[in-house]
């Protein structure tokens, strides 16, 4: 699904919009900062519907900060490997209705090496492989549910001087993004 993210195209602003449906002026994050969002979010809607959401993310990333202070579970780890292992464990346990998993390894690597550097592409490939693993686990462990699975980036990126990567500008490379979704009906 081709989409266009919001400006400025930096992670906390973009995640604010992604999980609230509101523009930055409404959800309150207009620059790279990580306050707790206090307006209604997808997580709040799930909680009102008596669903059980969880966030699994890396320490100090936007996902581990801006959606805190809700009556839900948060699993915060220092490494992507720990994040992915916990996400796999939670999928297999089948105790949550919504699992938000955030891996910041491509973004971090892209900033240091450039968007298409071998190390950056390896991080991107690792994220695709993790998503494929989650997909297979969901297919085998969530058969009794109607399930929507998504791979949703928050912003794009571009190369800057010195072969580094960046984002945050009003340009196609930073704003044009693609989300991938799949739906799996409950098996009766």
Tell where the protein language model's regions lie, with residue ranges.
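Feature captures the catalytic ectodomains and active-site-proximal regions of enzymes
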Residues: 1-188
